[in-house]
């Protein structure tokens, strides 16, 4: 099954030279630090604003952002794997992603279990989605 068959609606356009990602770990040169609180930072895709960070985790192989995207997608909270972050600008409180808004919007949903997004099958599906889309 191709990524386009697996995720209805096809895959949106993205940055042509996007690097391979490790979805659930912060990129080493992103500017992430466990001492910095990212709550309230703006999340920006390559083509515009996604929303504001409600939660950021820093667990090995399980790091992600929970983004309030209600202004963009009515009633939506999105989970963005930390590996999609290209750089964090602490002075402007912006987190920049390596993909488009449409790629984030079209991602398979990740449902919380006990308030955390740790459901392994859903996380694996989300990781496959981003790896397939970003490796094109």
Residue ranges and their predicted role:
Residues 1-136:
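Peripheral interaction segments used for macromolecular assembly
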